[in-house]
C-alpha cells in the first residue's frame, strides 16, 4: 500500500484504489491478484447502502487508505468481500472527523466460519440478487430519462418556456 500524490501520478491503465474504490488510473501496479480491499480511513463506516469493502481482481495499485486482504485457502474471496461489505464497525473505528479502522482492530473482526461449499452457495445467491438489483437500476435510469423527456414534451423546456407559461419565484 503506497500512496501517490495526485500531482505525481502518471496516467495509465491500472486502477489506483483508495478507501472507497477507484480514485484514478496509473501506469504501474503493485498487486496482481484476487483481493478484498477494506477501508482503513475515510471509509463509508456505518453506511447501510455504501460498502466498506470491495473486491479487486488483477493488476492494480492500492493506496494507504485501504487494508489489502488475501483470503486464506478455505475462504472464498467473494464470500470474504460480501461478509465485510456492510460489517458493523460500531466500536471498532475511532476518530472524530475522519474515522479509522486500524490494522489491530481489523484483525479482531470475525466472519462466520462455514465450509467452502456453503460459502460458494451463499455467493451464488448473492450474485443473483446483485444481478437483479443491477437490472432494476438500469430500468429506473431508463424511466428517469423517460420522465424528463415527457416533461419537456408536455411543458417545453423550462428555460426557453416555448408555451409562455407564467413564472413565479420559488
Where are these regions (language model features)?
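Short, flexible active-site-proximal loops enriched in glycine and acidic residues
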Residues: 76-77, 91-98, 116-122
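Residues at helix-coil transition
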Residues: 85-86, 156
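Non-catalytic DNA-recognition/assembly elements of restriction-modification systems
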Residues: 1-18, 108-124, 135-170
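Juxtamembrane/interface motifs at transmembrane-helix termini
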Residues: 46, 99-102, 140-145
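A generic fold-level signal
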Residues: 9-11, 30-31, 61, 101, ...
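A short beta-sheet element
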Residues: 18-85, 94, 102-106
Amino acid at each position: 500500500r503506497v500512496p501517490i500524490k495526485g500531482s505525481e501520478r502518471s496516467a495509465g491503465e491500472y486502477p489506483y484504489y483508495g478507501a472507497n474504490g477507484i480514485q484514478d488510473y496509473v501506469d504501474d501496479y503493485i498487486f496482481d491478484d484476487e483481493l478484498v480491499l477494506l477501508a482503513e480511513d475515510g471509509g463509508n463506516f456505518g453506511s447501510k447502502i455504501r460498502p466498506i469493502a470491495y473486491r479487486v481482481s488483477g493488476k492494480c495499485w492500492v493506496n494507504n487508505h485501504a487494508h489489502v486482504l488475501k483470503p486464506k485457502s478455505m475462504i472464498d474471496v467473494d464470500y470474504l468481500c460480501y461478509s465485510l461489505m456492510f460489517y458493523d464497525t460500531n466500536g471498532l473505528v475511532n476518530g472524530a472527523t475522519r474515522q479509522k479502522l486500524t490494522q489491530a482492530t481489523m484483525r479482531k473482526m470475525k466472519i462466520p466460519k462455514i465450509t467452502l461449499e456453503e460459502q460458494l452457495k451463499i455467493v451464488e445467491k448473492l450474485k443473483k440478487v446483485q444481478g437483479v438489483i443491477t437490472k432494476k437500476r438500469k430500468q429506473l435510469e431508463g424511466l428517469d430519462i423517460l420522465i424528463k423527456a415527457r416533461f419537456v414534451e408536455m411543458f417545453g423546456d423550462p428555460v426557453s418556456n416555448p408555451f409562455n407559461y407564467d413564472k413565479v419565484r420559488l
